[in-house]
C-alpha cells in the first residue's frame, strides 16, 4: 500500500486565514461600537432637557460668554463703549418709572417743559448692543390700581426677563426695589426679601435672600428655569410678593406685583422692566371655607380618633391663584398643647380631599379639659405658611364645635362626622 502524504503548506495557510478574518471582525466590531455611541450622543443632545433650576446671586452672569462671540476685555471693552450710540440717560427709567401698571403715563409725574416727550414714550427692549421698541400692550398687567392704592406708595420693583433658545432656559433677574415703606416702626427700616412664583401651576417657587435694614434693596439675583418651552411662556405669569422678615412673628407683607407674560416678546433679547408695587389683593370672602371632621372617643382605651375628611370652598389666598391646602391638628390639655399632627398637602384646589386618620392618647379621664384645634394652611415653600382658616372643637367651643364635642362625649365608640365653618386664624 502506498503511504499517504499530506501537504504541510495547507496547514501553514490555516492560521493565516483565521488571523485575517479575526482582524476584520475586530475592526468591524470596534467601528460598530463607535457608531452606536455617536448615535446615542447625538440623540441625547437633541432631546429637551429635563426641568432644572439654577439660582445665581449678586449678578453673576449664568452665561459667562455670549452664545455667538467671546467676551472682550481691556481695550476692546473701551472701544465698544465709545462706538455705542449715545442713549439719553433717562430713556429707560423715566419711561418705565412714570408708567403705571396699565401702561399709562400720568401727567402729574411729568417734568415741566417736556410733557409731550413722556406722553408719547413707550417701553424699551434692550438688546446686546442695540435697542428696539415694544408695543405698550405687551407690558400691561392685568391688575389695575384703585384710588386708595395709587395714594399709598409701596415702592417700585425692577427686574429683567430673558429666554435662551439654545439652552431652552427662561431667566428672571430680580434687580432691586426702591422706595419700600418702613415696616419696623422703631428703626424706620425694613428687612426685605422677594418671593416669586410661576403661575398657574405654582410648582416653581423661589425667593431671594433677606437684606437687612434697607428701603432700597439691591438683590441682583438670577433665577434660571430649564425645560420650559418657549411656546408655553405666553401662557404663564409671574407673581412677586415683597415681604419684610420678622424674627419674632410672621413676616410682614409689603405688597405684590403680577406680570402676565402673554404679549411679552422675548425672542429678540433681554427685556428690562419695572412695576409699581401694589397692596396685596386678598380676597375677602363671606367665609373661610368649611372642614369635614369625624371624631370618635374610645372610653375603654382613653383615645381620641380624629379623621380629617374634606375641605370645601377654600378662598384664594391672593392673586397667585388657588391655594395648596393642608390641615394641622393640635391637641390641647388645659390650654397646653400636648400633641400635633398634620395632613399631606393638596395642590391647587379649593376643595381638598384628605381622608387622613390620627389617634391621640388622652392623658386624663374624660374629655372635659381636652380640645382639638384645626388649622387649614396654604403651603408656601421656603417661607412661613399662611393660615386660611381655623376651627376649635371642645367643651368650651361655641356653635357646631361645641355641639360636635358634646355628641362624642354622649356617644362614645361612635364615629360622628360633621361639617364646620372655618373662622379667621
UniProtKB/Swiss-Prot annotation:
Residues 135-146 have a biased composition (Low complexity). PANTHER family: SYNAPTOTAGMIN, SYNAPTOTAGMIN-4. It comes from Homo sapiens. Disulfide bonds: none annotated. Signal peptide: none annotated. GO terms for cellular component: astrocyte projection; axon; dendrite; dense core granule membrane; exocytic vesicle; glutamatergic synapse; Golgi membrane; microvesicle. Expressed in melanocytes. Expressed in brain. Within brain, expression is highest in hippocampus, with substantial levels also detected in amygdala and thalamus. Pfam families: C2 (PF00168). Residues 38-425 are cytoplasmic. Residues 1-16 are vesicular. This is Synaptotagmin-4. The keyword Phosphoprotein applies. GO terms for biological process: calcium-dependent activation of synaptic vesicle fusion; cell differentiation; dense core granule cytoskeletal transport; memory; negative regulation of calcium ion-dependent exocytosis; negative regulation of catecholamine secretion; negative regulation of protein secretion; negative regulation of retrograde trans-synaptic signaling by neuropeptide. Unlike in other synaptotagmin family members, the first C2 domain/C2A does not bind Ca(2+) neither mediates Ca(2+)-dependent phospholipid binding. An aspartate-to-serine substitution in this domain inactivates Ca(2+)/phospho-lipid binding. Residues 73-83 have a biased composition (Basic and acidic residues). It is a single-pass membrane protein.
